[in-house]
Amino acid sequence: MVSVTHCDSLWFGADIITMRGGNYQLIPQGAIAVTGDKIVWIGPHAELPPIHAARQVVYEGGLITPGLIDCHTHLVFGGDRSNEFEQRLNGVSYAEIAANGGGIISTVRATRQASEQQLLEQALFRLKPLLAEGVTTIEIKSGYGLNLESEIKMLRVARRLGELLPIDVKTTCLAAHALPPEFIGQPDDYIDVVCNSIIPQVAVENLADAVDAFCEHLAFSPAQVERVFLAAQKAGLPVKLHAEQLSALRGATLAAKFHAISADHLEYATESDVQAMAKAGTVAVLLPGAYYLLRETQCPPIDLFRQYKVPMALASDANPGTSPVLSLRLMLNMACTLFRMTPEEALAGVTCHAAQALGVQQTQGTLETGKLANWVHWPLSHPAELAYWLGGQLPATVVFRGEVRP
């Protein structure tokens, strides 16, 4: 370990859950030394070397975890789809709602009509509850514009959120989310627009950190998604994929072929899909909120992910139609209750594995020397409580890049 003699701040008095290697890796009565926005020393307080700290912060017990990471959201959108919630309760399926002009397309209409400022104000309202829970990094997708102007508008709003609030925002271009109304019956023509116009322009303006697509019978075929991925490769952007949510189309295998950083949903993933993901290093992002709201019965193949050592991340999937979820902690409980994940796996899913799903694992997701000083101090005695309680105690303190977040 590099010798440290000075630091900007020294934090101690709580147990530290580092999440190194995907495990709790508890440091009882730990200490963290920070210079700038980085951790320069971490370990048991009793082993702290002589360090001169410009400032000291003493916690009175509790737990410190890495800052939470919500690695899959659709937080920027216009309109309201609470009426669809009532329809689904009355037995109307997601596919039927979409076929009747609802679903994603109704949000597309509202998003296209909204100004950039209106979208920003609505997204700020949705983002603040996640910040209050200790989220320090979030991914936000486009996908409700479905034309060049509106997709860029959404991505600009997402970038702006990261400028206005103390949170890291990663943006994803999801132009291949649904078929826009002006291209009904012409999916290949729309994919031409995505590949030849939207993705190149988004890359030129540096508005996206990745490209995503929705591979499903009510969205785009594997062949169409492959074209999107090739365009992303040409633009120098990594890829992700909504795959195997409602049916088995081998989208996860396609994602693995392109070394996608993540494949998401995965309720219908097969063993061969999981094997391909394991070989490619693709993270499985599980979305229990959508599973719950859609009353799905096919669980993602958790045991296969364990068997083949595919990292499992969790996310809110915050969106207006299938997962109106503004609580990442609720997803921890749902993952344990619905998917039979362990509390330790669930916490890894919103820290180290979520970081990997965004390609930021070198700087975030665990508490260790050299990484960003992003953490949450909880008034709890055991990390399993984060998944155990439904609602309840919010963080006592959130530290973002070495400073207490207001």
Swiss-Prot record:
Cofactor: Zn(2+); Fe(3+)
InterPro entries in the cross-refs: Amidohydro-rel, HutI, Metal-dep_hydrolase_composite, Metal_Hydrolase
Catalytic activity: 4-imidazolone-5-propanoate + H2O = N-formimidoyl-L-glutamate
Pathway field: Amino-acid degradation; L-histidine degradation into L-glutamate; N-formimidoyl-L-glutamate from L-histidine: step 3/3
Pfam family, one: Amidohydro_1
A GO cellular component entry from the record: cytoplasm
Keywords, sorted A to Z: Cytoplasm, Histidine metabolism, Hydrolase, Iron, Metal-binding, Zinc
Name of the protein described by the UniProt record: Imidazolonepropionase
